[in-house]
Amino acid sequence: MKRQENVLAEREREFQTKMKVIRRTHHKNLVHLLGYCHDGPNRLLVYKYMSNGSLADVLFTLEKQPYWIERMEISRNIARGILYFYEECMPQIIHCDIKPHNILMDESMCAKISKFGLSKLLKPDQTKTFTDIRGARGYVAPEWHHRMPMTVNVDVHSFGIVFVCLFKPLKNKLV
């Protein structure tokens, strides 16, 4: 579960739209949103429980280190989830915060993308958008530092950093 407090009134419509889209997304590599409730400006999002924690827990805990073949499968899972955002979702979703802490692992060690709080929805005729910088230092795409429009490439860049973390696991200095 994730609690969001003090949601501003002007963001209510954006929140409701995002919840409608996320509730309609069904893919084996996305964490399933079971529902949400609200009390005034406070929100409680309920996601399916992921028993193996986050990819960060797996990568940065010596006892949980995956084998190379498992690392390849984890990278495929993440890539499939990102591809779903761009090729199958309507509207398209730019996640904006792909990082090991936002990739959750189910009981079979299948990687699932979670935490859509920073995501942006693209309109059907839209290929890019402008927004304030979002995401974790070390994982954000260079476009944000140059105030360029955001495209699906920002998630591809973040995935590249996660991919490096998968195959060269070091102490987590990026987050």
Language-model-derived ranges and their functions:
Residues 1-175:
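Conserved eukaryotic protein kinase-like
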